[in-house]
């Protein structure tokens, strides 16, 4: 496993774990209705934003359009169904015909725990972790959901769309010069 791949895996896990640490008891009453009029009857997750199928949130066609590269394979994995206060998650891994890779991780929380404290904690944790690999700081990105930040060098964009939804776009094979703009364009498709 390359150093870059290990860094991406470490940051993805760190961000998801840190994002789960917010305390939001009592916020779940209407949280599952954000973004959709109909919701999954068992979990409350919006039917139009199924976090357990990240490949449906950003499709292969949308990925190909933004990346200007044909997607040869898209695979969903790391699926976790919502259960009580535990979030629903998944990851879609896209492989391009040219050998490039990208991934999209999605998260929906039944308790609306994407509060300022959880987001700040996740960002601080990522910033501390990334210092081991680069001297470039984590960058805030405005105009995307409730909060967003970009991790240079590994080309990862973390977007907290609202109190219940989060998307993490990682474009490890994209050139550093275009990766941030491409990740932002992909995140907009998840909104």
Predicted regions and their residues:
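Extracytoplasmic low-complexity, Pro/Thr/Ser/Ala/Gly-rich segments
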Residues: 31-90, 94-96
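Bacterial lipoprotein signal-peptidase II cleavage site
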Residues: 19-37
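Short, solvent-exposed recognition patches
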Residues: 70-144
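A short, solvent-exposed beta-edge/loop patch
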Residues: 40-51, 55-56, 64-65, 134-191
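Sec-dependent bacterial lipoprotein signal peptides
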Residues: 1-18
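Short stretches within intrinsically disordered, low-complexity N-terminal or propeptide regions
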Residues: 11-14, 36, 150
